[in-house]
Each structure stands twice: as structure tokens, then as C-alpha cells.
Amino acid sequence: MRCPSLARLPHRAVSGLTRTPVRFQSQAFLTARCASTAALRSATPVHQSVLNRRYQQTRNASGTAAAVLEAAAQTPDSLSQEAIIENLDPVEAERLSRVRNIGIAAHIDSGKTTCTERVLFYTGRIKAIHEVRGRDSVGAKMDSMDLEREKGITIQSAATFCDWVKKDEDGKEQKYHMNLIDTPGHIDFTIEVERALRVLDGAVMILCAVSGVQSQTITVDRQMRRYNVPRISFVNKMDRMGANPFKSVDQINTKLKLPAAAVQVPIGAEDEFEGVVDLVRMKAIYNQGSNGENIVVKDEIPEKVRELAEERRRMLIETLADVDDDMAEIFLNEEEPTEKQIKDAIRRATIGLKFTPVFMGSALANKSVQPMLDGVIDYLPNPSEVQNTALDKKRNEAQVKLVPYNALPLVCLAFKLEESSFGQLTYIRVYQGTLRKGSYVFNARTDKKVRIPRIVRMHSNEMEDVSEIGAGEICAVFGVECASGDSFTDGQLGYTMSSMFVPEPVISLSIKPKHSKDYANFSKAMARFQREDPTFRVSFDPESEQTLISGMGELHLDIYVERMRREYRVDCETGPPQVAYRETISQRVEFDHLLKKQSGGPGDYARVVGWLEPTGKLEENQFEEQIVGGSISEKFIFACEKGFHLSCEKGPLIGHKVLGTKMVINDGATHMTDSSEMAFKNATQQAFRKAFQEGNPAVLEPMMKTVVTAPAEFQGDVIGLLNKRGATINDSEVGVDEFTVYADCSLNGMFGFSSHLRAATQGKGEYTMEFSHYEKAPPQEQRELVKKYLQAQADRHKK
């Protein structure tokens, strides 16, 4: 038998695992496993007639949960999501069916925060609507930083909890709980989007009705695919001049390569935008009231859009027939699908990552946001319908499934940290078990035991204290010292969540407070920002005696410098941007190095023999020992390995990290009294420096995947700008009124590009960059970098 709402569930493995076919398994499978579970064995047979019915049911339920947990750990591939759902406690199944963990993501300035503001208003989360650039601390809850309100961009992901009351077809009202996360659109804050998608079960992708799919929309799409997050689409700004929602639908199909079809058509557009026609129910929907809070549904579709609505409904059914077997059968039999059949097909295809339904409206004009919320309930999965995995540290990090049962041992993830007036606020997603106030949990990374003093949910203008949070929900806790991405358990399981994808920083700045009295606050700010943001790094360069901050781009670091000034009242001086270069060798070099210092008393003696060679890929460095006969003891080998890794932290060429280099030690010699771990560490470092210089060394520079979008008339100017910077153009797309160029550019060549692009395109061009890979810098640039480094070293020695 096929369950229409669960036919194609996403097999979501957060570490990018491949999807496997969904299999149904009966209760009998788990009953048999349950019977063999040691915890449930009994010396005497248990008879229903003897025991209290309720006690027996509770015992059976806990036994089934234990059996499911065992199957999830031992044979995760054979345990289907349907079997997990089938064996859910009925009360738990009802609770989870009413939960949605969703995010809102899109290109910058597509109206994410404006849309979220309406969602909060219509769900009763806030009492009045306030715009993105406003100064009201209530209305601008999702942009709570002054910096966000001034710049009109979202920097951090803001999380909130709200209730949405949806009317069923029979008119009965049902309350659903939504955990909603608003995310940044700017590429420099991409870690915020990664963190949000990591813990969400579904997303709303917002597009501009005028611009359609833009460069950052493509990045967000790639992130959603990485975490297998199903999404519905919302074409916003239908009241703007030049609004064309069907261009967005076409671009989702062509640019994002994702089948899409409109589930609504607009009644009017631009200044005359009145409402939408629901293509599933074939009814007209209008918003009334000063803030569009009243929904009016009419059976009569306006004559001016009737033909368009019928045509688009046919296209919706045809698209669904391409991605859903049941709808294909109905379509081939030339039958007219019912409203329920269309809804079920949309839900199956959306959750199966094969389709996205496209809604349309205008958040700023307070029109058609509520039908989009109904779409979240109808078409996005609840927590029990999504597969999540963890790693079992006790079994060599074997992959296990997480089961959203409250009765099972706790597994949860801290995905975001914030400072508040009450202390550190930690956002947590519970995947399995129950998180209770006052309970103790174990940090899987540090193995430290931590007490949970307070649990809150963001609700109705304030934090709502709760005593416990069940599986599948998101909450915030106070008083827990941890880092972003830490996993927590109750100690019964040795599970850790596979970590989020965290890109390496590509740009650095030297930074110091202008006034020495500010060093205490400066240190506090640095420590806090590092805990909150894994892509923000702080280091100290002992040679230049400078503190360096590293991040994803100029804006990323500028925001933190500005936050330090506003939140900690620390004015800072920053140096010019520094590129994160790397060093490597190009050929194999053998070495035989002797360190010998014997001038009376304890001396140093160490001889190391081996070779350096490139690994073939510009990835991690490798150390290997191939010693036969014990010429170097094991403790000295460890010292050699330590010396190698220390050498890789600061290369001989320009003082940057070494990449893609392998050291092999296959012989050596020791002295009975003068050999020590320190001597072998130093000998390895000296051998490394000498051999590295002989191995045809090279400087590597970071290459950035760059996407430039501008009006079509500026295509020649933009191509010229990229060519001047030595970019490699990989692809280009020319639309009706704009074009997009995809190129690989060196980060060093892209400094100042934004101002030149604005000048060349009359302020209409935009671009995004993200790290792609390392490759050798041009010879002239390498020579200049080496010369500059040697000069700096000489100047330092003179002092």
C-alpha cells in the first residue's frame, strides 16, 4: 500500500550522504527485533490478561522505541523512515505533524526580512508591522542589531517561534507550530545560511518578481541541495513596476534545473495587483483590512485572469505528471485530478526534492502572505518525515540514524550562539529524546558535563520559559558554555552530529585598539565573535606582533570591526587586507640532515634521512615513517612528526602555511646520551626548510568563484574589467535585459572591484565571490612576494 503523503521522503544526511530508496517495513520487523532485545527479555512469559492494560501499552511502546533505536544504530540502511513513523507513539505523531522547522532564504534585497515581518504579524508574534530600515526594537526583531537596521541587510540568522492557525477543507481550524529562521542574503555571511539549513526541515525561497533568479539565489539553491532541504518558492514584490512572476518560474526551471510550476496566478500586477487565484482549488483570494489581515476567498474567478488560470493549472498538472508517478497515471488516463490528488502530488514531489510549488504576492503591500503560510503546512515536511544522521564515537564514528522519539536518549545540536542581556543564548535543535530544564547534558566535543538552567522559546514579544522540549523542536538555552556546532547527549549514547560545512577564511586584516585601555573589551569581543561565527578567526603573528582577524570577505570583517565599536565601544585601527596565500613544492627532494651540538655537558644529536614530495592534490599535508630496524625510536618519531607540522604552519618562502606536501623518514641515527625529542624536532624542521627550498617551491593563491550580473548593455565593459584582473571566464548567460558571467578570479586581483563595477555599470551591476581552490600565482607575483618577505625579515633583524 502506498502512503500518498510519504511516498518520496528525503533521505537527508547532513554530511552529504547519498540518498537510498525508501522501503516500507512492517510492525512485525520491529516486534521481532524488540523480542530479541536484551532489555526486554523476561524469564517468564507475560500475559495481557494478567497485567494492567495501560502499563502493558507503555511497556510495549518503550520496547518498540528501544528496538527502533537498536535498528537505527546497528542497521541504519535497513530502517526506513516509514518504519520510524509507523512506530511513533500516537500522541507524539500528532505533535510532530503540527511542527514545521523552516527557513527563509534568498538573494540580498529580495524581501526576506519584510516577508518574515508579515509572517510574525499574521501569526500574532508581533502586534504591529515595522519596515526593514525602521528603528523599532519590536518590529525589527528579525533585524535586531542597529547595524542591520541601518544597512538594511540581515547579518545574523534570527530565530523565532510562532503559531499558525490553518483552516481545513471542512472549515475546522488547526493550530501549527513554526520555528522560523530568517537568514542573510549576502555571500560574506553564508555561514549563517549554512547553519540555518543544517537544522531545518524545509525552506521558503524568495525571489524578486522583477529580477527573478539572481546570483545569490543560485548559491542558496546549492546550499539547499547540499543539505537536501525541500523548498517552496515565493515570488515577492508583485506590486513593483515590471513584475513578471512567470519569468521567475521559468528561471527556476532553467537556471536552477529544478522542476517548478505556479500554484497561483496574480489578479493584476504592479499598481493594480489585487490578489491571487489558487490553482489547486480554483478560487480567488484577496486580502482586506489595513494590514491585509483578513483573507477573503471567492469562488468566482475574475474574467480577466480566468483563461490564464486554466492554462497555468494545466501546466501545473503536466509538470507534476513528469515528477510524480500517481499524477502521471491520472494524466495518462486523461482523468481530471481532484484537489486532494493535486495537493498530495505536490507534497510528495516537494518533499522528494523533485519539484517546488511557486506562490506569489507582495509582502510590502500585505498581499498573499497567508496563502504562502498555508503552503508551508501543506507541502513542507514535519520533523518525523526527514532523515537525520549522527556519528557513533564508540564505534569508530559509524553512521547512525536519529529517531525523533521523546522516550529515547537525548541527541541535540547547538547551531547558533548569541550574546543577550542575560548572558550567552544558545540555539539548540533537538533531534532525539527530550531536553529538560535542570537536567545535565554532555558536550560531545569536550566531554564536559553541563547543566541546563533555563530553556526558552521566542514567543509573543518575549522569551517564553518552558520546562522541556521534545524531539524535532528548536529552542534556546541560557548558561551553557559551548561553541557553534557542538553536539550534546544525556550521556547514554556516544553520538556526535556530523559538523556543518565551514569554508576556510580567505582574507585577513591586522587589527588593534586605538587606546590601550580598551584591550580588555577588545579581547572579550574577539572571544565572543569566534564562538559565534566559525568562519571568523583570530590569530597572533609573533614576528610582526600583530593580531590578525580572518574571514570570508571585506564586508564580513568590516561588520565585525563596526560591531566592536558599537557593542563594546572599542575603536580599532586596521591594516590593509592580506590574502591567505599557501606554499607547496613541485618535485621530490631527498635529505640526510645531522644536528650535532656537543661542546661539553649535555648536547644535541639527531640525524634524519628521508624525502619531501608533493602529495598530488593541494590538500592536507602528510607525514609517514618507513624506518626498518629501529634506527629511530618511536618517541623520537613523534617528535619528528611534530617538527614537520610546525614547519608546515609557516613556510620558508613567504611565511604562509604549506599545502600538499608529504614528508617520509626512512632512516636516522641517535646518540645514547645526547639525543632528545627536542633535538629530533629541531633536526626535522631544519631538514624541512633546506629540502623545501630545493623542491622547486611555489606560492599558491586563492581562486574565487565569481558571478557578475549586470544589464546587457554593459557586457563589454564588465568582460574588460574581469580580463584586466586576469580572470578565467568559464561561462556566460545573456537574458532579455541582463547578462551573467561566471569566472575564476584570484582574490588578490579582486580588491577594489566593487567600486570599478559600479562605475562601469552606472551602479546597476552586482557580483558575488566564494572560495573555489588554490593554484600557483603568476611567476612575477611570486617573485615580488618572496622579495617583500625577505626584506621584511631583514628589517626585523636590523632592529
Swiss-Prot record:
Principal place of residence: mitochondrion
Species this protein is from: Emericella nidulans (strain FGSC A4 / ATCC 38163 / CBS 112.46 / NRRL 194 / M139)
Family: Belongs to the TRAFAC class translation factor GTPase superfamily. Classic translation factor GTPase family. EF-G/EF-2 subfamily.
Keyword Mitochondrion: yes
InterPro entries xrefs: EFG_II (IPR041095), EFG_III (IPR009022), EFG_III/V (IPR035647), EFG_IV (IPR047872), EFG_V-like (IPR000640), EFTu-like_2 (IPR004161), G_TR_CS (IPR031157), P-loop_NTPase (IPR027417)
Protein name in UniProt: Elongation factor G, mitochondrial
GO biological process, one term: mitochondrial translational elongation
Recorded metabolic or biological pathway in which this protein acts: Protein biosynthesis; polypeptide chain elongation
Pfam family for this entry, one: GTP_EFTU
Residues noted as binding GTP in the record, renumbered to the chain: 106-113, 182-186, 236-239
UniProt transit peptide range: 1-24
Gene3D superfamilies in the record: 3.30.230.10, 3.30.70.240, Elongation Factor G (Translational Gtpase), domain 3, P-loop containing nucleotide triphosphate hydrolases, Translation factors
GO CC list: mitochondrion
UniProt-listed PROSITE patterns: G_TR_1, G_TR_2
